[in-house]
C-alpha cells in the first residue's frame, strides 16, 4: 500500500516524548484520513527536518471517549484534548532519524516556493524536495509500535505530563549519553530535574 507522504511540523519542546517512544499518539485539529509517512520538521529555533515518522490511520477522539467511564483519567484527558480542539489521535508507529538533519534553508534552495506548514502539507506536490529527502542517510528505526490496541495509559496524555514520568527521566538520561544527542537539538517543556 502506498502511503500519503507529508511534511509535518512540530514544536521542538514537544519532540522528546516521541523520540523516547513514550508518546504513542500525535493529536491534531485536522489530519489526513489515512496512514501517512511524515517527514518531521522541528520549527524555530531548530528549523530542521530531522527524520521520518510512520503514522497509522487517525481516529476521532469524540468517538473514542464514549468507551470510557466519566470518572477515569483517560476520559478526563480525552475531554481536555477535545476542549483544545484536538479532534484526531494519530498513532505513531515508528521513528527514524536522519544522520544529518536538514536546514529548512536547504529545502527552500531546492524549491523556492516551498513553505513550512502550520500543520502538514502533501510532499508529493514538491517532488524535488521529496527526492532529496528520500536520499538522506538514516539511522536504524528508533522504535516500532503495533497499534492493535489503544494505549490507554498514554492516550491524550500531555507532553508536560510525560516529561514528569520516571520512564521519561530514565530514557532522557540514556539519550544524553548517546551519540545522536547532538543531532536532535530540542529542549524540554518542564525544567529538567537532575
Q: Where is each model-derived feature located?
A:
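GIY-YIG nuclease signature motif recognition
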Residues: 53
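Compact alpha/beta protein-protein interaction domains typified by the UBC
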Residues: 42-45
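Short coil-to-beta transition motif at edge beta-strands of beta-rich domains
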Residues: 31-40
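Contiguous surface segments at macromolecular interaction interfaces
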Residues: 1-5, 10-29, 47-50, 58-194
Amino acid at each position: 500500500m502506498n502511503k500519503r507522504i507529508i511534511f509535518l511540523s512540530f514544536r521542538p519542546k514537544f519532540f522528546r516524548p516521541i523520540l523516547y517512544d513514550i508518546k504513542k499518539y500525535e493529536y491534531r485539529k485536522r489530519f489526513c484520513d489515512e496512514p501517512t509517512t511524515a517527514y518531521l520538521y522541528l520549527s524555530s529555533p531548530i528549523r530542521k527536518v530531522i527524520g521520518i515518522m510512520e503514522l497509522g490511520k487517525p481516529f476521532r477522539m469524540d468517538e473514542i471517549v464514549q468507551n470510557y467511564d466519566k470518572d477515569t483519567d483517560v476520559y478526563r484527558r480525552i475531554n481536555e484534548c477535545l476542549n483544545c480542539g484536538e479532534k484526531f489521535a494519530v498513532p505513531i508507529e515508528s521513528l527514524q532519524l536522519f544522520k544529518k538533519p536538514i536546514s529548512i534553508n536547504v529545502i527552500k534552495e531546492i524549491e523556492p516556493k516551498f513553505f513550512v506548514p502550520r500543520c502538514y502539507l502533501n510532499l508529493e506536490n514538491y517532488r524535488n524536495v521529496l527526492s532529496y529527502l528520500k536520499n538522506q542517510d538514516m539511522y536504524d528505526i528508533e522504535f516500532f509500535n503495533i497499534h492493535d490496541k489503544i494505549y490507554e495509559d498514554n492516550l491524550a496524555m500531555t507532553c508536560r505530563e510525560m516529561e514528569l514520568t520516571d520512564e521519561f527521566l530514565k530514557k532522557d538520561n540514556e539519550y544524553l549519553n548517546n551519540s545522536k544527542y547532538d543531532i536532535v537539538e530540542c529542549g524540554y517543556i518542564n525544567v529538567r530535574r537532575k
